[in-house]
């Protein structure tokens, strides 16, 4: 299959072909058909690969430079070198036609569609703005201003750094997922159980769209979701009553060796409390310790809700930098939970904990409980211009009815999950006042928008 290079404008509704499918521009031909277009490229142009903007940390005297804290990618400025073969006086028409494609202030951006020769798949870049400059064609005696029939055109564009495909790829399709870390189904599903995560960001995180139907039992007001490297579940079953502060039974050793070699991972502790009395007067926290009991991190106190049956608790996260050292032994931690009373006697049983080594974690606040047939959507990818699926500038969340008509918005707090090779999707949901039903299930669909820096990995 031959090379295809197109400008697709939501503003004009026109598709202009910048490369002739026969390999030779047709003088005076229609630019709206691949076989008759008078446009061509002057050189072996290919989209420039995005260079990352780095957010660094550390450094200073005697340090080996700085550590990488975050990656982002800026817009790209580049020039597409075009030529136009027309008939007498047509150069002005070609220039105006190109300029009209970018009248996008009150429309979605013009799309640059690229399909390399021999590839079956094309990708779409969003062009934010463009400058069209005509120039004299080599070997001619007439400039564009003098009505030259053939001209060079420099198409100077500012575009987004990534290109997307015309369709999302489904990683998880209407799968039943649980609300606890054990049993079948449990609360995590591998992204690559049936489909490989693709694209140039598969190890950096590429956008996901998540759809969760209302669970079979609960009516969630908040949903926790994450992209995780691993999850460790441990039953604790420790009951405590106190008017001051006391500790639950500690977990056994949990392997966190991956923190040494995967700098972006963080550790998070979540858990479930049952059989509560006066929970509104209680707070809990978790301490991360070495396998021998030395304190590594003390997470903040968490206020409990009012539900007395069972509550889901997000104890918080830590980077555990103290363990990122070059030792060969397995690196393990134990988790010690505590409960304290703010007033009077309080009782709770720490049923279990889960320790997540995670890439991304967020809490989606639904503003009101999900009702029958409603769905929660967390959207990291968009195709508003009608072409490829590209990242949202910021992930959006909303509640819809069963036909996906919007009902109300929701709020994403934290970093919405992204797709990583080898990672899994993890979830937990709660009703009002922190109420948690471990046996609850829901249908989950997760779709993925592969992103491409250039055409080198497009097939």
Task: Identify the meaning behind each predicted range.
Residues 21-35, 40-41, 218, 225-362, ...:
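Polar, enzyme-active/binding microenvironments
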Residues 1-229, 281, 325-328, 358-459:
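Extracellular/virion structural assembly segments
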């Amino acid at each position: 299959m031959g090379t295809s290079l197109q400008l697709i404008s939501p503003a004009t509704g026109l598709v202009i072909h910048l490369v002739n499918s026969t390999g030779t521009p047709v003088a005076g031909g229609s630019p709206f058909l691949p076989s008759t277009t008078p446009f061509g490229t002057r050189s072996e142009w290919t989209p420039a690969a995005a260079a990352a903007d780095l957010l660094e940390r550390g450094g200073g005297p005697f340090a080996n430079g700085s550590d990488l804290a975050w990656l982002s990618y800026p817009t790209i400025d580049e020039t597409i070198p075009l030529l136009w073969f027309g008939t007498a006086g047509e150069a002005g028409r070609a220039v105006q036609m190109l300029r009209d494609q970018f009248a996008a202030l009150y429309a979605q951006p013009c799309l640059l569609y690229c399909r390399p020769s021999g590839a079956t798949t094309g990708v779409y870049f969003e062009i934010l703005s463009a400058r069209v400059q005509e120039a004299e064609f080599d070997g001619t005696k007439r400039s564009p201003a003098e009505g030259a029939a053939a001209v060079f055109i420099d198409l100077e564009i500012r575009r987004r750094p990534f290109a997307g495909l015309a369709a999302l790829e489904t990683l998880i399709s209407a799968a039943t997922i649980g609300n606890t870390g054990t049993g079948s189904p449990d609360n995590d599903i591998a992204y690559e159980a049936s489909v490989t995560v693709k694209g140039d960001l598969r190890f950096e995180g590429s956008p996901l769209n998540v759809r969760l139907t209302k669970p079979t039992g609960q009516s969630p007001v908040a949903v926790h979701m994450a992209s995780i490297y691993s999850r460790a579940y441990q039953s604790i079953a420790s009951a405590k009553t106190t008017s001051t502060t006391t500790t639950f039974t500690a977990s056994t050793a949990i392997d966190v060796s991956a923190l040494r070699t995967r700098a972006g991972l963080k550790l998070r502790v979540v858990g479930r409390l049952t059989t509560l009395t006066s929970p509104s007067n209680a707070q809990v926290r978790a301490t991360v310790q070495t396998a021998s009991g030395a304190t590594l991190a003390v997470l903040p106190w968490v206020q409990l809700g009012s539900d007395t049956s069972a509550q889901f608790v997000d104890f918080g996260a830590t980077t555990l930098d103290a363990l990122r050292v070059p030792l060969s032994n397995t690196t393990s931690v134990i988790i010690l939970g505590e409960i304290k009373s703010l007033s009077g006697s309080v009782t709770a049983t720490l049923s279990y904990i889960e320790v997540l080594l995670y890439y991304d974690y967020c809490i989606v606040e639904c503003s009101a409980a999900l009702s029958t047939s409603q769905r929660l959507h967390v959207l990291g990818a968009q195709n508003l211009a009608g072409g490829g699926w590209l990242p949202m500038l910021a992930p959006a969340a909303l509640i819809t009815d069963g036909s996906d008509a919007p009902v109300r918005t929701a709020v994403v707090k934290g970093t919405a999950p992204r797709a990583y090779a080898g990672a899994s999707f993890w979830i937990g949901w709660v009703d009002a006042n922190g109420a948690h039903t471990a046996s609850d299930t829901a249908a989950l669909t997760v779709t993925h928008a592969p992103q491409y820096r250039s055409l080198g990995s497009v097939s």
